[in-house]
């Protein structure tokens, strides 16, 4: 299964954690996206790194086409201009 590695900055870790990390597991899992890890750098709490199992390369893009997912991402405080992702395969 491919892995998606994401790096981003968020406005506030606590808001991001509550809204995105803890609050959207069901929607991600319904899209076949399984969270492996989401956390922040030890000395930079607004610098976030994430790893997901994804069923195919475009899974996260398709998931973000969902209006509820888009709204949740915006409310979580992701700074989209800093978002970088790469799909890896083993």
Identify what each model region corresponds to.
Residues 1-90:
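Short S/T/G/P-rich N-terminal loop/turn motif that feeds into the first structured element of a domain
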